[in-house]
Amino acid sequence: MTSPPGSALRSLYRASTAARPPLRIGLLLDGATSPRFTARVIEDIAKSNFARLELVVHNMHAPRPSPPRAPLPARLVRLLRNSQTRKLLLYSVYLRKDAGRAPVDDDPLAPVDCAPLLAGVDTIELEPIVKGFTHRFPPESIERIQGKQLDVILRFGFNILRGDILKVARYGVWSLHHGDNDYFRGGPPYFWELYEGAPVSGVTLQILTEELDAGVVLGKALFPTTPGFSVARNRCDPYRGSATLMMQKLHELHQYGWEYLKARAIPPAPYLGKRRIYRRPTNVEVARWLVPTIARKAILRPFRGARAPHWRIALRTGGKPLYAQANPADMSGFSWIDCPRGHFYADPFLIARGGTTWAFFEDFLYSESRGVISCAEVLAGGGLGPVRRCLERDYHLSYPMVFQHDGDVFMVPESALNGTVELYRATSFPVEWKLEKVLQRLDAVDTTVWHENGRWWFFAAFADPPGPCVTLLLFHADSLTGEWIYHPANPISTDVRRARGAGAIFNVEGRRFRPSQDGARGYGYGFALNEIVTLTPEEYRERPTVTVEPSWSPGLIGTHTYGQCGSVEIVDGCSLVRPSAVR
């Protein structure tokens, strides 16, 4: 249970091992000053070993910096005279007030001067042919762009594109749609997700075609919708993630080729949005959403800080195991284990050794704000024996992934705050452990290890800090301490509802299950079991089988780790308590 300080995703997606010529990239921009997330893509391309910036096309029809604003009364009079702007006035006022809620140091829409990043890149200043919201490129500009023999054009500017520009690059014009295109088409980005209470806010990368929202969807990423009433905050994670998504697909194109990229495109699906096209909200719509939202926040404000999240673990023996169930899951029969004052217990794992089942878990020390790893014997009656501390570092540890191999017991705890993936071996099980090797210097979260058919598999989650973990990557090696090989099916998931690991993979009755967290409604909200259907060095497929939400036990607000060993099951749960009662 931790949030890493940095991300390895940028460095991973800057390096390709394929022996192919570098991708020739063109950029469509509205000017040298671009949002921070765009600047990040430009920087990553420039620092990659597989792509080259060959051309920049500046939109000379883009809005220019606004002249000095008129006094407020004059602006109000001008707005109120227009019936259309009158209907939308409240949203404009809301945006001005909400702008101050954006993060000061890491706003992905903050303007960045990209001129230094683009120094030396050929530039075209282009006046598009404008018709309504549509832009077409003049024939002479098309000829010049064709001369660059571009592989991909990345659209960060201009309006809706039509005409020959869509065909001039070998693999088309790639464009980001800031929303999940299966549910939200139109705009403004990330407002309607808040308005409708959508659990996730997405970003979609597509290859543009003549038909709006009908391009080839190369990929999408889904982030938790930020609770509350701030679009400025809700947009941050998806915009940051859009830069990662674009680099991931460019990397995939170079590493594996166009046919592979095209085969992994997301197939068309029926549009499920409540509106055909979302538009700027009217005054009535803003008021209908904003007033009750603010009122609810005001009512809850006096209680903020009175309750704090507190995690515990629970055991069940002899019940119908979760893997054998379908939705809705039956979680009856679990018994909670109380934590001593000053501690919480979470991230439980089970292992059988010498006829005894042991539980390993994160033992969080409130006084030091860090986790250590503790363990206890699972008693025949379903409780735990004495809790014993078994692994401690001067940095936070959690998610004690314990497993056996060739008679030894190993552990890979999460140590993302140290920027490492560490392998420990038990020298005197269960309480004495020795660092065997630092497997990777990556800020991987909740690394889950699996051994099958002579190969080792490492499932690791990553974040775009300071955002949540929405990216699951799979690596494999020919030995436990061998070199990690990036799996071609990566990313396994870019969905906050199923990316992050939620416990050890297990095999029962010939079926393999990977537990995964659902963080859409808040950190550690729920979890699911996913049956692994295909696992080879070339392919990976899984399917969800059963999901668990915190409603299974009164008072829970989260439940995010599950383990199974024989007839014993273990789970954790989070509830809100008075801090004075547990610290």
Language-model segments: residues:
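Short loop/turn segments immediately following beta-strands, especially the blade-tip
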Residues: 427-430, 477-482, 531-541
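Recurrent small/Gly-Pro-centered beta-turn motifs in extracellular repeat architectures
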Residues: 361-363, 413-414, 460-462, 516-518, ...
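Short glycine/acidic-enriched loop and turn motifs that connect beta-strands
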Residues: 364-368, 416-419, 463-467, 519-522
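One-carbon transfer enzymes
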Residues: 2-397, 401-404, 409-410, 422-425, ...
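Blade-level signature of beta-propeller repeat domains, shared across WD40, Kelch, NHL, RCC1
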Residues: 526-535, 553-583
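Aromatic-anchored, glycine/proline-accented short structural segments
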Residues: 436-507
